[in-house]
Every structure is written in C-alpha cells, then in structure tokens.
Design a protein with these regions (language model features):
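Charged, low-complexity intrinsically disordered terminal segments
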Residues: 2-538
Length: 538
C-alpha cells in the first residue's frame, strides 16, 4: 500500500492528493456511521481520535449545511471540532488504512460536469436514443428491468446499431424479475428475446438475479478472481454481500439504473427500460411550464409512470464506470480496466459547473450512505427542502421525521403518490406515520391527484443548492437489501431548474390540509400491522 506513514502526525504540507482524498473519504464515511472494521485492523486508535470531535453532532450538521458531503480540504478544516492538530493526527492514522476499500465505500466527487434533467417517457426515451446513437467506443448499461415492449425494442435496436458500428456493449439486467412483466402481460417480460439478438451481435450480458453465491461457490469463485488479478477492494464487496444475505439470496435485488458512454456521458436515474417508464406517447403537456425548452406534464395513459433521469457530461463517468466494473466482474463478466485509455474520456472533461458526488450502497454495506443522507437532510433542515419519492416505508426515516420539532419540520415538503401506488402498503405506512410530522409543520402532497403513479425519486435542498437523484427508495429494501446508486448534484442554476420541475409536480398534486387523513392512533388500524409485517419485501 502506498504512503505508509509511521509518524504521529503528518503536517498539511506533506499531504499529497491521494492522502488528502483518503482523509476526506474517511471523515465522510465515519461521520455517516461507517464501521472501520472493513478498512482497518485494529481500528481503535483512529476511532478514539475522531469520536470526541463528533460528539454533539455539530460536524454532521455542518456537513449537511454545505450539501451533505465534504468534497475538499478547506471544508475539512472548517468542520466544528476538527483542529489542525486532529486532522494531522488523523492523516497519520488514515495513511495506514486500506485506501482501496475506503474509496469503494465512500462517496466519489467530480467537478465541472454539465448536468441536464429529464422527466417523463418521451423526453427520457429521446435522450437515451440520441446518446446511444452517438456512442463510438463503448456502452455500459445497468438496469433492473428491460422490457420486451415498444420502447424496450427501440432501445435494443439502437444498441444493435451501435454494435454494428463496432461499439462495445455490456449490459447488466435482472432477467428473472423482468420476466414477471407488467399489467398482467408476461410477454413483455421476455427479455431473452432481446438478449439473444444482442449477444448474437456481440454484446456481453450478465443477469443480476444471480448476485449471491453459496458459501462453497463463493470460496471457489473468489480464489479464481483473485488469481486473475481482481483487487481486494472489489472482492471484499462480495464478501459483505455473502455475510449479509440469508439462505438463498432471493431477497437481493440490483436496483441501480445507470449508463456510461465513451467515458464522457453518464445517465443516472430512477427509471427502468420499458413502456411504463420510457414510453413514447405524448404527455398531457403544460401550456405554460417548460424547463430547458421541454414541457412539463403528466402521462396520458394509466399504465405510464411519471419518472426521470439525469444526463451528465464530464468526469462523473469515471467513478461510475468503476462501480459498473466491480459488479460486472463479481457477476462473472470479462475483465476490463476503467483506467485504460479506451474507457476514459479522449479529451477535456470540463463541460460545466456542476459538482457531482456518487453514492452507492449494497447488501451488507457497513453503513448505507444514501439512507444517512436522507436522515441528515431532514434532521438539519433549515431552509426549503423537498423530497419526492414513491415509497415511504423506511422505519428509520419515519422515526427521525416524527422526532423533529416545528423549527425543522416547517421547512420540509414531501410529495408521494399516496393513493395511486403499485406498493400495497405505502398508503398504510404514510397514514400510520405522518400524523405527528404533519402537526409539526411538514407539508404533504399526494401526486395521485393526477390519477397517475410517480416513480420519480429526487430531493431539493435550497440551502446548499443541491439535488439528489437515483434509484434509492425510502423503504427498508433500499436501505438494507438492494444494490442502489444515486447522484448528489450541487450547482445553483441546475438546482433551480430541478426545483421548477418539482414545483410543477406539486402544482398538479393535492396538498393535504386535514390532519385526519393520517392516523393519530396507528395501533387502532389493521393496515399498520400489515405494513410492519411486510416492509422488508417488495
């Protein structure tokens, strides 16, 4: 391992870029509650150094005030309780940690990206097809569901054209869950009809349903991967999955949704591929509200869902491709190195002004950084904060929200499809838990007023001009059982555009004004117990 220091302190002047990043990663990870056992043995010394500085929560509150993540050395020096002496002592201890593992667990930040937001099927489908058509070297796509319907086949056709141009195509899809189809239509679940065509044309595919090995299988597979040169920072990720999963692994889902093209373009979202998400039917468009020249609106058909994604141009593609690589190799895919010239940008990656921080989680992770982001977002709310999410079934979220006083609650707005929802217990979870937060000042909007389902997952934090978007649901599955991925974007102009999108959704939703729509005494309602019994499952 590089930079093994034995001094009690390492002065700022001696910090190279690698050590600086390691200290930032460590502090972010530890403030969020991450266990050091995954990256240090023994870890008592470094834990004792930082524990006193974190007492009282001032450092955590400051981190949320600046957007939810520390991204530079200056912010480290401004953390309450973190003196120069403490940071220099931490540097000496952090230099002994396994930086590869630490970086796999901590958020990854890039700067000077250009980010654009898209909502509803037509916008997202058009953009996806355009970006695939531009690909010249490679396309890496990870998605939970890829349906054999109109838009699914249009995207498949675009991938086939890319293969004809000599573009490398790698896909990770959950074949088994896709096979369930939607709307009582099993035919749309026949992804094998698409995958067969793609494989015959030269694409490489992996089924993410097989994310767990038996103990014997993993022991053998781990030895094979290690012999092939796969680094420990990747292998230990599957170790954690193996330790966490019970029996069969059937309750593990790769829920991530992202794409990387040519090392320069990334797409991150909450949508899958198929007519529920990437439908081509024109929306019922607003006559007056547009963002970047694209109209806001509501899906016309009941079976079409409101959803969205971000397109990012810039350096964010590199850490995203590293995430793809780790899953790809652990699933049995062919080796590739995201640092190779083929997979990096061919030129300048400065496309804009947005700072992008990538968050990932997986079954067995020492701490779920996305869950912790949401908890801190509400705990330290001091300005307008909006959360849009389809499923509100995370007990930790509700406990934290119910414990807030009016001085925090008054800044919070939640938008959720309360009545029109594909999860049978979302309504019960909200009605059983929202009474106290509502009385304390949290605003609640029901997107069901549109008679459509919103699958969009996004937050807006006015204080730090930050937006968070990705696959993460506010439920027990995303918090504990699934592979998830999200992007925190900081930038005033971009945040304002996303806020305009959210404001449109709020304008077509129903604002709940009567506290009696929520349960003052949840224990009196049978649905409360059904929600409690099933909250760990899809």
């Amino acid at each position: 391992m590089k930079n093994i220091h034995i001094n009690a302190r390492i002065s700022f002047g001696e910090w190279d870029q690698e050590l600086q990043q390691d200290v930032i990663d460590f502090v972010n990870y530890y403030i969020s509650g991450g266990s050091l056992r995954a990256v240090a043995d023994p870890s008592e010394r470094v834990s004792s150094l930082i524990a006193a500085a974190l007492e009282g929560g001032a450092a955590r509150a400051y981190r949320q005030e600046i957007g939810g993540v520390i991204t530079e050395l200056r912010q480290l020096t401004e953390l309450p309780g973190f003196s120069t002496e403490l940071l220099e002592q931490l540097a000496a201890e952090v230099s002994r940690l396994d930086s590869g593992k630490l970086r796999a667990l901590a958020p990854r930040t890039t700067r000077n990206n250009q980010v654009d937001a898209y909502v509803n099927g037509p916008q997202c489908l058009e953009m996806l097809l355009e970006e695939i058509a531009k690909a010249r070297r490679y396309i890496h796509l990870s998605v939970m569901l890829f349906f054999n319907d109109d838009s699914g086949n249009r995207i498949a056709a675009a991938l086939l054209h890319a293969l004809d141009r000599g573009v490398q195509v790698r896909l990770m899809v959950n074949y088994t869950v896709t096979a369930l189809g939607y709307g009582h239509n099993l035919a749309v679940g026949r992804f094998s009809e698409i995958s067969d065509r793609l494989e015959q044309a030269g694409a490489k595919l992996q089924d993410t349903f097989h994310s767990y090995y038996s103990a014997m299988e993993w022991s053998r597979r781990r030895a094979e991967l290690k012999a092939q040169g796969i680094p420990e920072r990747i292998l230990f990720l599957q170790d954690k999955v193996q330790e966490d999963v019970e029996l069969t692994g059937l309750n593990v889902i790769d829920h991530r949704k992202f794409m990387i093209i040519d090392g320069i373009t990334s797409i991150v979202g909450s949508l899958n591929i198929g007519d529920q998400y990437t439908f081509a039917t024109p929306i019922e468009a607003s006559a007056s509200v547009q963002v970047d020249g694209r109209p806001m609106g509501v899906p016309v058909r009941e079976e079409e869902w409101h959803d969205g994604c971000f397109r990012i141009r810039g350096a964010a593609a590199l850490p995203l491709n590293a995430v793809f690589q780790s899953r790809w190799l652990l699933l049995g895919g062919d080796f590739y190195d995201p640092e190779d010239a083929l997979y990096r940008s061919e030129g300048n990656t400065d496309f804009g002004s947005e700072e992008c921080t990538l968050f990932v989680s997986f079954p067995g992770n020492p701490v779920n950084l996305m869950q912790q982001y949401y908890l801190d977002l509400i705990t330290y709310a001091a300005d307008e904060t909006v959360i849009v999410n389809p499923y509100l079934i995370d007990h930790a979220f509700w406990d934290r929200l119910s414990g807030l006083g009016p001085e925090r609650s008054c800044h919070l707005t939640i938008c959720n499809p309360l009545e029109v929802n594909d999860h049978p217990t979302n309504r019960a979870a909200v009605r059983s838990n929202m009474y106290v937060p509502f009385c304390n000042g949290v605003s609640f909007y029901d997107y069901s007023a549109t008679e459509r389902f919103s699958h969009w997952k996004i937050t807006y934090d006015h204080r730090s001009h930050a937006v968070f978007h990705g696959s993460y649901n506010i439920n027990e599955r995303s918090a504990c059982h699934d592979f998830e991925l999200g992007l925190l974007v900081k930038g005033e102009a971009f945040a304002a555009k996303v806020k305009a999108m959210i404001d449109y959704d709020l304008s077509v939703s129903r604002k709940i004004t009567d506290k009696r729509e929520f349960f003052k005494h949840p224990w009196m309602h049978p649905s409360t117990y059904v929600n409690t019994a099933t909250r760990n499952y899809t």
